[in-house]
Amino acid sequence: MDIAVQERGAFGWALVTLSPGERFVSEAGALFRISDNIDFDVTTRSRESGGLMSGLKRMLSGESFFFSTYTCADDNGGEVGLAPKLQGEVKLIECDGKSRWLTTGGSYLGSTEDLDIDTQFQGIKGMLSGESLSFLSIEGRGQLLVNAFGRITEIDVADSLTVDTGHVVAFEDALEYSV
């Protein structure tokens, strides 16, 4: 599998090239082009976790209720083009399996099928912040696509930093945070 971010900046999108038998997962509604030999299915689950309850929890976090899963159906390989619903930048994150990533509402675009996706509740502070009640929790070894309305700036936090949760895209769970 090859994932390439195209058109960096305000009009970003991702081209996922699948080899025979490979699968990729995205938020429903992200697909804008697909090869004829790619099968896709829409479900409420990522891998073997969740189902209806996971879909409802994702909705509370500002994400889609459904996932789309793309599978290369023959021996030739194929392509899937994904774009965020709102124009903005797309970033590819390599997940090493040692840490968990948290994404904020609306920033998950897609991932390799070997990543586990769940919802992490922020508590009453999340509800009072005016933003989503939860984050998507993503762990495992694989690749993750996130997006933002506008540009994504990667920041290494040394001491402390205050950022409005409405402007956070994704962060590793090793980062101590409060809402």
Model region roles, listed by residue range:
Residues M1-V179:
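Composition-driven recognition of glycine/serine/threonine/acidic- and proline-rich low-complexity segments
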